[in-house]
A protein has these predicted regions:
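Conserved non-catalytic scaffold segment of RNase H-like nuclease domains
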Residues: 2-122
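A short, structured active-site edge motif that brings together acidic residues
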Residues: 48-53, 134-152
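Hydrophobic/aromatic-lined pockets within catalytic cores
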Residues: 123-127, 152-156, 186, 209-216
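Substrate-recognition/cap helix-loop segment adjacent to the acidic, metal-dependent catalytic center
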Residues: 114-142
Length: 225
């Protein structure tokens, strides 16, 4: 499907996902994807970038990547142009330009705390803390995991489905990963998340849209109790 033209009557959201190397205390982004969407999940623009400074220049770090077995995928995507290779500052500039063009200050992610941390950590690591923040000042961070907990997690059908399939955490809570939520909302019970930036964005925007369609009260902001 071709990206939609900008409709100035709509409010836009940047749905974003990162894949990282290094440890969870200092995650460094090598893959970042985002899509400009509305709350119904319509896609207006898609972006996929490989961070040159981490992926190609930090080869030892890349061997620590959680999904290191997927690295050949990125070489193929960089070769065929499916993902653009760029320096971090260029990626940041393009994101800021997209946010300005679509007049949005909202960035949403699934488990947004991690993506906010990974982009901030990468920004500080590459600039030696000269520049500390990746997103424009005043950006509002949304978390589809919070939305899903408030909407999908309260549905008796979801609880029954999780119990039937064994999607229960050790503490008894229902699992809320993007992969499992997408299996539920799509009916594709064999679905496996790709764990690459843009591909994951395109299922996470469906989670956002599903939550909106239920017309239930839900928290959206990352730092909202």
């Amino acid at each position: 499907m071709e990206p939609q033209k900008i409709d100035r009557r709509r409010n836009y959201i940047v749905m974003l996902d990162t894949e990282t190397a290094n440890d969870l205390e200092c995650p460094l982004t090598y893959d970042i994807g985002w899509a400009i969407v509305d709350k119904w999940g319509t896609v207006y623009r898609k972006r996929s970038f490989i961070n040159r400074e981490i992926f190609f220049l930090e080869k030892d770090l890349m061997q620590s990547a959680y999904y290191a077995e997927k690295l050949p995928i990125y070489y193929k995507r960089s070769a065929n142009g499916e993902s653009k290779v760029a320096n971090w500052q260029t990626i940041k500039n393009i994101l800021w330009q997209d946010m300005e063009e679509f007049e949005t200050k909202i960035v949403s992610a699934h488990n947004a705390r991690f993506d906010y941390k990974s982009t901030s950590t990468t920004q500080r690591w590459l600039t030696k803390s000269k520049y500390r923040y990746f997103f424009p000042y005043g950006t509002e961070i949304w978390d589809t995991m919070k939305m899903a907990r408030d909407v999908i997690g309260k549905m008796p059908t979801y609880r029954k489905w999780c119990e039937l399939n064994g999607y229960i955490c050790k503490n008894g809570q229902l699992k809320m990963t993007a992969e499992i939520l997408y299996r539920f909302i799509s009916g594709q019970e064999e679905f496996d998340e790709e764990h690459t930036g843009l591909a994951d964005v395109l299922i996470e925007k469906d989670i956002l849209a599903y939550c909106y369609r239920q017309h239930k009260k839900m928290r959206k902001k990352l730092y909202e109790n």
